[in-house]
């Protein structure tokens, strides 16, 4: 069954062939189109810069992103991981787009205590794609728990989305071709399982 996939690509090297992340994005898109999925791509660094979130009302740019997300079955957000978070442009995108009451509402129980109720994105799928420069064991055992769990709290805990991960380790400029191809095959398999 054909699905609509919204991709928010957060890397300053977004042109084809310019980065490992761009290769992941392009492989994902090529495989998705072969299967018959529809792609809605934004390159965050190629878009008008989003203002820092200030708690105010969303502007037309944010409302457009939200409309496109509502029309999609799957959202994929891609970014390298720097200092235990996604890069600042991607984090700012998340902070501005996934806010209440659009993404979730709060059910008040007592005073300031309550819980989130998913809204516009409930039961959609979120694929979180992050790349790390460090080795798999160190990051998977210790460090990557921080960004992975925070994003899961946002997309699953608050927004009610089903979360899947696409993680890559030891993403360095001198990556051997064999490892690169192994990563691209992982991307293709992820798309085939959607």
Where are these regions (language model features)?
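A short, flexible beta-alpha/helix-coil linker loop
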Residues: 11-14, 47, 132-137, 170-174
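Short hydrophobic segments within beta-strands
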Residues: 8-10, 42, 129-131
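N-terminal beta1-alpha1 ligand-phosphate binding loop
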Residues: 2-35
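A structural preference for short, hydrophobic beta-strand core positions in alpha/beta folds
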Residues: 40-43, 165-167
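Helix-loop-strand module that forms the ligand-binding subsite of alpha/beta enzymes
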Residues: 57-152
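Glycine-rich phosphate/pyrophosphate-binding loop and the adjoining helix
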Residues: 137-194
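N-terminal beta-loop-helix "entrance" segment that forms/cooperates
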Residues: 41-60, 178
């Amino acid at each position: 069954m054909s699905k609509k996939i919204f991709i928010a690509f957060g890397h300053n090297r977004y042109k084809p062939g310019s980065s490992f992340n761009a290769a992941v994005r392009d492989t994902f898109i090529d495989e998705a189109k072969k299967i018959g999925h529809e792609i809605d791509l934004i390159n965050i660094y190629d878009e008008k810069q989003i203002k820092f979130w200030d708690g105010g009302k969303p502007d037309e740019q944010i409302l457009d992103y939200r409309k496109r997300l509502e029309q999609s079955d799957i959202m994929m957000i891609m970014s390298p991981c720097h200092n235990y978070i996604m890069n600042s442009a991607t984090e700012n995108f998340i902070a501005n787009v996934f806010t209440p009451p659009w993404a979730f509402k709060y059910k008040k129980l007592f005073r300031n205590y309550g819980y989130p109720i998913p809204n516009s994105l409930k039961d959609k799928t979120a694929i979180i794609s992050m790349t790390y420069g460090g080795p798999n064991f160190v990051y998977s055992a210790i460090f990557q728990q921080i960004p992975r769990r925070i994003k899961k709290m946002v997309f699953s805990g608050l927004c009610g989305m089903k979360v899947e991960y696409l993680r890559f380790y030891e993403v360095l400029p001198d990556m051997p071709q064999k490892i690169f191809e192994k990563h691209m095959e992982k991307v293709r398999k992820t798309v085939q399982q959607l």
